[in-house]
Amino acid sequence: MIATRTLDGRLVRLVPLAPAHAEVDARWNADAEVRHWLHRSEDGPELRTRAAVEKKIREVIADPYELRFVIETREGLPIGDVGLLGLHPHGRAELSIKIGEKSHWSGGYGTDAILCLLGFAFTELALRRVTLIADADNARGIRCYEKCGFRHEGVLRAHRLRYGKPLDMVAMAVLREEFAPPADDGGRR
């Protein structure tokens, strides 16, 4: 699904994903520390070149069940991406987020991006539920999701492999009626 407009948060702007973002995304994907927290941490080099990422971006844009944005600082620096996967006619989708610029980790940018996207998802897309799964050892990410209103729904035991070892994952979700956008957003969401 093509994102058609920019969404504004307190710290970030969500701009529609475009092939022009391929170079920066390939750089993030090539960083082992960034990749460690992604569900594809052991992927081969296929999404680490500009050409491969550009091809993938074109596929994402053409997919009617996926909506992706690049996270930019208010100054226009791309720092990651956020999106909704598996958009379903029953009003649900799965959240995906990556902060690729490590200098922006733990600065509130991911929280702001998620809150901005959730506001859009529940109001303009009329979703009922947004889910996610996170590595059980990703304490920073889980705290962020909790701040955004996600609740724990269960543990997926030995759900994926990371570096050849089974890893538990935490299933979380937020419902439309549970979501409360921040009061200090100045009406930007």
Where do the protein language model's features map onto the residues?
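GNAT-family acyltransferases
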Residues: 1-103, 166-167, 171-189
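Core beta-strand residues in small-molecule sensory/regulatory alpha/beta domains
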Residues: 72-73, 156, 161
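Conserved G/P- and acidic residue-centered "switch" motifs that form tight phosphate/ATP-binding loops
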Residues: 76, 108, 138, 164
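Conserved beta-strand-loop-alpha-helix junction that forms the acyl-donor binding cleft
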Residues: 99-102, 132-142, 159-163
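Conserved acetyl-CoA-binding loop-helix of GNAT-fold acetyltransferases
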Residues: 106-120, 142-147
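Conserved GNAT acetyl-CoA-binding A-motif
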Residues: 123-133
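Conserved active-site tyrosine of GNAT-family acetyltransferases
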Residues: 145, 150, 172
